[in-house]
Amino acid sequence: MATRRRSFPLVPLLLFLLAAAAYGRLISDGSPASASATSLLSNPVSAVIRLTTSNSASASSPPAAAPEEKCEQSYGFLPCTTTVLGNLFLVLAYGFLMYKAATFLSAGSELLLEIMGPGLVGGLLLPILGALPDALLVLVSGLSGSRETAQSQVLIGMGLLAGSTVFLLTLLWGTCVVVGKCDIGPNGVAVDLQNNKGFSLTGTGISTDVQTSYAARIMGISVIPFIIAQFPKMLKTHHGQRLAVLLALIVSFSLVLAYCLYQVFQPWIQKRKLAYAKHKHVISGILRHAQMEALGRLLNEDGTPNEDVIKKLFHKIDMDESQTLSRAELHALIIGINFEEVDFDKNDAVDKIMDDFDTSGNDIVEEAEFVSGMKRWLNEAKRSVPTSGAYSNKFITDYHARTRQEHDLLVDRSDETVESVENPGWCITKAVGLLLLGSAIAAAFADPLVDAVHNFSNASHIPSFFISFIALPLATNSSEAVSAIIFASRKKLRTSSLTFSEVYGGVTMNNTLCLGVFLALIYIRNLTWDFSSEVLIILLVCVIMGLFTSFRTTFPLWTCLVAYMLYPLSLVVVYILDFVFGWS
């Protein structure tokens, strides 16, 4: 029988740490006698002990002359302090609670998605729940207190916004490349599960599918609200700043809605893309079949279609020598071609071929129509496959292999169906419970965490932006970061694509939903928009990484160095602009 491990008592430790930052001093009733030790001994009721966190008072100085630093307890009972170590402890404690809140929200969201499947749940609810901890921290950073206090604390919210975006696109992105790297093959694509080249900066890396590039482009579009809000500052004018904030606010939430709707209807988009990929694979199969039958080269040396070979293929398919191709003859052609276990409806394939070739609408394909259609197919193949100038027989083989790869990637996505779960009622209850628990923890401790960061900034004289930029994203994004790293370590194109899509999706929600909450706070409380350096680093990182990831699908190992360097560069840029050039 396993012995139970005794845990260290947590409550005494907390009390000890809190008490270590304080000391006692005598508070008199105002009479001179009460200040002496004799009076204290003779009249113990006339003096009491008060705990204070002020370090400026001394034992010999009168109480009235000692300046007091005060801290305000959150909800009237949570601990507070004005010391550096005390506030550091509170930042770590509240940050850990926000991490647990994010973990509960993530677990509940995944469980709910497993039960109910994609659609409204996966497309609308889950992206919002994933961004909830960050959104709450941004909201409470300027919600309470006077306008001056809110203007001071709202910098914490901007630090979290910038820090989360930069963290995801630099440290997390680079780490996923490192743990997910595979050997890059001769075709420039990472080979699944093959990692024999060590840490070669150019010979290893990761590959993603084209849909991941689309997610990166959406992420790039999500910076538009930042540009709108910053536009008056770019023109060096104070006129229209409030209008710019309102316009950016509207655009932010419009982008959130558009992104969620895109997520909702993505299954239909995937089905449409899958049908198109199957059709392209049929085209490439017919082209390859023509070459395998030794009818000749379909393309001349200069890349133009070889009409003589195309006509030979037509007459070979025309079994009854009627000078036309019927549906039955096209169906026989499809059956005779080995499509390497690609599952599709052959009648549907015949329909699509007929649609491509039968321009006259008489439900048969004449020789001229066949030649014209084959030319279109060959031109499509030439656009899809890069060549070195010479169009050899290998060109058609490469095109067929590429269409097969596109088909397989989309089949993987279309196979993401909802599996039946045991006891769905209990699973739904558990999922809702996790979501409520995570939301409650995030809502309860967001404000104390912001206060602790603000107090730590005052005590340590470190700007609150840098604290929130570095520390808060670790608290709110650690759960997703660990999951992303574990998923990327499976070293497959499929898992890498899903991992980086999630990263880009997280940045998109930061730049839309969380920014929208921040802009609403600025507008409603009539705060000043003065975040030029912060907006600059967000634009810098998003534009560089967005352009970098939008137009390529393979990333060698050296690209992680670029991502890693952007993180300290962002901090240096903010420091120089704010404290050297005085932007803020």
Curated annotation (Swiss-Prot):
Residues 305-340, 345-380 form the EF-hand domain. Keywords: Antiport, Calcium, Calcium transport, Cell membrane, Ion transport, Membrane, Metal-binding, Repeat, Sodium, Sodium transport, Stress response, Transmembrane, Transmembrane helix, Transport. The chain crosses the membrane at residues 77-97, 120-140, 154-174, 215-235, 245-265, 426-446, 466-486, 504-524, 531-551, 561-581. GO terms for molecular function: calcium ion binding; calcium:proton antiporter activity. Ca(2+) 2 binds at D358, S360, N362, E369. InterPro entries: CaH_exchang, EF-hand-dom_pair, EF_Hand_1_Ca_BS, EF_hand_dom, NaCa_Exmemb, NCX_ion-bd_dom_sf. GO terms for biological process: calcium ion transmembrane transport; intracellular calcium ion homeostasis; sodium ion transport. Pfam families: EF-hand_7, Na_Ca_ex. Induction: Induced by cold, drought and salt stresses. GO terms for cellular component: plasma membrane; vacuolar membrane. It is a multi-pass membrane protein. The keyword Transcription regulation does not apply. It is found in: Cell membrane. It comes from the Eukaryota. Ca(2+) 1 binds at D318, D320, S322, T324, E329. The keyword Acetylation does not apply. Belongs to the Ca(2+):cation antiporter (CaCA) (TC 2.A.19) family. May function as a sodium/calcium exchanger (NCX) and participate in the maintenance of calcium homeostasis. May play a role abiotic stress responses. This is Sodium/calcium exchanger NCL1. It comes from Oryza sativa subsp. japonica (Rice). The lineage of its organism: Eukaryota, Viridiplantae, Streptophyta, Embryophyta, Tracheophyta.
